[in-house]
Structure formats: C-alpha cells, structure tokens
From Swiss-Prot:
GO annotation, biological process: nucleobase-containing small molecule interconversion; pyrimidine nucleotide metabolic process
Listed name of the protein: Cytidylate kinase
Signal peptide: none
Source organism of this protein record: Streptococcus uberis (strain ATCC BAA-854 / 0140J)
EC assignment: 2.7.4.25
Subcellular location, record wording: Cytoplasm
Family statement drawn from the similarity comment of this UniProt entry: Belongs to the cytidylate kinase family. Type 1 subfamily.
Main location: cytoplasm
Primary enzyme class: transferase
Residues that hold ATP according to the record: G10, P11, A12, S13, S14, G15, K16, S17, T18
This protein's UniProt keywords: ATP-binding, Cytoplasm, Kinase, Nucleotide-binding, Transferase
PANTHER family according to UniProt: CYTIDYLATE KINASE, CYTIDYLATE KINASE/PANTOATE-BETA-ALANINE LIGASE
Organism placement in taxonomy: Bacteria, Bacillati, Bacillota, Bacilli, Lactobacillales
MF GO annotations: ATP binding; CMP kinase activity; dCMP kinase activity
Gene Ontology annotations for the cellular component aspect, listed alphabetically: cytosol
Length: 226
C-alpha cells in the first residue's frame, strides 16, 4: 500500500488546516501546516521591525532559529522558532494582516518551499497552504482546493479568535479576508490558484465532518489503487 502525498490549498479560513489535521490523524499521516511557517517568517519581521528590504536578515533569523513542530500533551501541534514557542504568537492579528507581503518575497518562499519538499519526500504526508498543489508538491497524488464564501470564512475566523481569546470585529474580519484574497491571488510569486488537476470543493454550509469525509474517501480510493 503506497503512502501518498495530499495537497490541500485554498484561501484564508476555508477550513484547510482543520480538515487536514483530522485526515492526517485518521490516516496516520504527518500533517504539515505550511501557513504556520510563513507566519513564523512574518513574526520575525514584525518582532525586528524588518521590511521588504531586510530579506537577508529574515532569512538569517530563520536559519539561526529553525522552525520545528512538536506535539503537545493533548495532541495539538506546537510551533517553535528555535527554542521559542510561537504557537499563539503567530496567530495574532498583526501577523495575520502582514503575512501576505512576507510570503510574497521570492527568497523566503524558495527557502520554505525547499524545507517543505524535504519533509514530504517520503510520502504519508498531508500539507495545506496556498501553493502546495501548484508549487510545493506539483506531483502530489491528491490535490484539493477548498473554497467558501467570505461571510462564512469570516464567521469561522471570528469563532476561532473567540476560542483563543483574541478580540475581533466581524465586519473588519470580512474586509481583511477579502483584502487578503486579493493580495494572495494577485501576487507575482506563487499566486493563490487551483492546480489544473485539483478537485475544487466549496465548503460553504458544509460541516467539517462532511469535508473530511469527502477528501478522505478520495484519498482512500487512491491508496487502495496504489
């Protein structure tokens, strides 16, 4: 039975990470949150007041403080920059609102994509992000592109923020998500788009379990055929 690679792409708050984690657990696969890696680079930039002109400094920080993922006692994923636990810090609004310009820097994408490919080379992995199926794993056995309405995605982000104790305004979240959609889909480097061979699935009004079932059935069919 072959260990496959699953790529899940889509815009902000389309449900990628939530379903990817569940499917990875169900299949016994490794889950890699590539978005967290770009958030780490953004956190570095904001913490040090770096701009687009400080690319080498950001890369140096990433080299000196490598990104690693660990499991908490409750099974949740922790994100570290060197020895610093940045799991919550990289989910703050200032990071969310700045990650687009950092992730648009070609040199940073090249470095993080190289790391992601090294991790995925043995298969049995599920990755979610913006360009997994188009750039990071163009030969992935299963590619999914999730979409959802701006209203639904803002509602999801609002609930997530409440659970994490982050103050947010629903209308502001809608504006921020729409703005990020535009930035992500219009950037010169690795713009947000579905791979030609990706399965596009609209999650608006669909439960998390419904999305998980849809993707997992596709994955299991490919695994059984391998």
């Amino acid at each position: 039975m072959k260990a496959i690679r699953i790529a899940i792409d889509g815009p902000a708050s389309s449900g990628k990470s939530t379903v990817a984690k569940i499917i990875a657990k169900n299949l016994g696969y490794t889950y890699l949150d590539t978005g967290a890696m770009y958030r780490c680079a953004t956190y570095i930039a904001l913490k040090n007041n770096y701009s687009e002109n400080d690319i080498s400094a950001i890369l140096k920080e990433l080299s000196e403080h490598p990104i690693t993922f660990k499991k908490a006692d409750d099974g949740s994923q922790l994100v570290f920059l060197g020895t610093e636990d940045v799991t919550l810090a990289i989910r703050q609004n200032d990071v969310t609102n700045n990650v687009s310009w950092v992730s648009a820097i070609a040199e940073i994408r090249e470095e993080l994509v190289a790391q992601q490919r090294r991790i995925a080379q043995d298969g049995a992995i599920i990755m979610d992000g913006r360009d997994i199926g188009t750039v990071v794993l163009p030969d992935a056995e299963l590619k999914i592109f999730l979409i959802a309405s701006v209203d639904e995605r803002a509602e999801r982000r609002y609930r997530e923020n409440l659970e994490k104790g982050i103050d947010s305004d629903f209308e502001t979240l809608k504006e921020e998500i729409a703005a990020r959609d535009f930035k992500d889909s219009h950037r010169e480097v690795s713009p947000l788009k579905a791979a030609d061979d990706a399965i596009v699935f609209d999650t608006t009004g669909v439960t998390i379990q419904g999305v998980v079932q849809f993707i997992q059935e596709k994955a299991e069919k490919i695994i059984d055929m391998s």
